[in-house]
């Protein structure tokens, strides 16, 4: 009988699943070097092979989506470096690796070292943008760290001469390939910083294989570039070649020629800038001179205006003007006094009582005549309107209608009868004629029918 605190019991499926998850999650992706054997490629396009060394072997699978990126055909017995994930094939419990990438062993080991150093330096922060130094603009002196016999130096000097012939260049000759190259590059960077002769450095070489460029993947070179006080432009190989030095440098140029373009200014552009600056200076000078000339003219004119003789002349002119104004004012005043006297004389004559009485009598006579004429006209118009009104009243008077043979019948209460339905038998009616009134009693009421107008058919 099992104890109450017995360990967990796995099924085979659960055991294989647990082991697979442990391998995939704990091991992750690894680099493995070994010799290929038992290489097969079925119709599916996947690769199946074994990696082995002197004492052990492991089954491998590389699926079609991954192996199509491999640039060579794997051969039996070939040494390779693979990047793979470790897993377990659960149905059989077979431990195997799933290969993601494959390289020949020599180049593969270098690539592995490259990736490891890149990850290490990136973790330390040597690639961070906050440490990148700005390039001087413009550069007053350029230092070049490269081989004095290489094509890279020729390209750099050619571009600098074409763009900015006056820019000083200091060459720090060093090996760029071989075992001694990293140490020489480091010493050249340190020497340039010690002398402090230039304000920007170009570190680089021409293109080549991964082994040829390996000096610029050296950790010592990377740390020397990072420690440099002088900004460094890396120019290693071609545009597709990326080294550790490119990540650490303050700026990466795709080629040595491009690096020379970056640190120099175009001579034609400089000439255009100089011409533009000269034009601006000439315009500023012209404006300044014109402004000073205008100011001088204003001051000169002001001084002339303040001259004593000119002031005396102005005062003399003003005195003469005042005298003329006084004479003119006196003459005007005398003239206005004479005119006032004449006006008063005329008013006095006009105010004579005899003249006023005569004018008043004439005015009274005119008013009496106009009043009599107005009264006669109004009386005639009133008589005419009265006659017209009498004639109109006679024409519309009911008495005139009765005089022509008509009569008006009304009930005892005075209501005029218009229809027989207003009359009842036995009621008293009053009939008004042209020459008197007849009072009668209703003995019968007969209603006449209205005749319909007959229309003829067409």
Swiss-Prot record:
CDD domains: ExoVII_LU_OBF. It catalyses: Exonucleolytic cleavage in either 5'- to 3'- or 3'- to 5'-direction to yield nucleoside 5'-phosphates. One of its GO terms (biological process) is DNA catabolic process. The keyword Nuclease applies. One of its GO terms (cellular component) is cytoplasm. Its main location: cytoplasm. It is an enzyme of class 3 (hydrolase). It comes from the Bacteria. One of its GO terms (molecular function) is exodeoxyribonuclease VII activity. Belongs to the XseA family. This is Exodeoxyribonuclease 7 large subunit. It comes from Escherichia coli O81 (strain ED1a).
């Amino acid at each position: 009988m099992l104890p109450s605190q017995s360990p967990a019991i796995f099924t085979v499926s659960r055991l294989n699943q647990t082991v697979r998850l442990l391998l995939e999650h704990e091991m992750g992706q690894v680099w493995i070097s070994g010799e290929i054997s038992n290489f097969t490629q079925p119709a599916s396009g996947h690769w199946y092979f074994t990696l082995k060394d002197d004492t052990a072997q492991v089954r491998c699978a590389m699926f079609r989506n991954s192996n199509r990126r491999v640039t060579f055909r794997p051969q039996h017995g070939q040494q390779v470096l693979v990047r793979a994930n470790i897993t377990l094939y659960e149905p059989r419990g077979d431990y195997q690796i799933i290969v993601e990438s494959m390289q020949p062993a020599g180049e593969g080991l270098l690539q592995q070292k490259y990736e490891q150093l890149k990850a290490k330096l990136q973790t330390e922060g040597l690639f961070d943008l906050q440490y990148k130094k700005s390039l001087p603009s413009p550069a007053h002196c350029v230092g070049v760290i490269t081989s004095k016999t290489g094509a890279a130096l020729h390209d750099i000097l050619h571009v600098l001469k074409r763009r900015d012939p006056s820019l000083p260049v200091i060459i720090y000759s060093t090996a760029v390939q071989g075992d001694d190259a990293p140490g020489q590059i480091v010493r050249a960077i340190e020497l340039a910083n010690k002398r402090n002769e230039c304000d920007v450095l170009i570190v680089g070489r021409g293109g080549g294989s991964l082994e040829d460029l390996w000096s610029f993947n050296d950790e010592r070179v990377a740390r020397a570039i990072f420690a440099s006080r002088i900004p460094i432009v890396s120019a290693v190989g071609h545009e597709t070649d990326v080294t550790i030095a490119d990540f650490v440098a303050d700026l990466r140029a795709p080629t040595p020629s491009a690096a020379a373009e970056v640190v120099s200014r175009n001579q034609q552009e400089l000439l255009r800038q100089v011409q533009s600056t000269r034009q601006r200076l000439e315009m500023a000078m012209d404006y300044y001179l014109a402004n000073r000339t205008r100011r001088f003219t204003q001051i000169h004119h002001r001084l002339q205006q303040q001259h004593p003789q000119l002031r005396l002349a102005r005062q003399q002119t003003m005195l003469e003007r005042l005298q003329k104004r006084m004479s003119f004012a006196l003459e005007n005043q005398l003239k206005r006094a004479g005119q006032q006297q004449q006006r008063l004389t005329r008013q006095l004559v006009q105010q004579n009582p005899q003249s006023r009485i005569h004018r008043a009598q004439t005015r009274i006579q005119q008013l009496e005549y106009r009043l009599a004429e107005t009264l006669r006209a109004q009386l005639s118009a009133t008589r005419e309107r009265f006659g017209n009104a009498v004639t109109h009243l006679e024409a519309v008077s009911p008495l005139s209608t009765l005089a022509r043979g008509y009569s008006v019948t009304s009930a005892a209460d005075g209501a005029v009868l218009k229809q027989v339905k207003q009359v009842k038998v036995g009621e008293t009616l009053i009939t008004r004629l042209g020459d008197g009134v007849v009072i009668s009693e209703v003995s019968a009421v007969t209603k006449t029918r209205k005749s319909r107008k007959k229309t003829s058919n067409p």
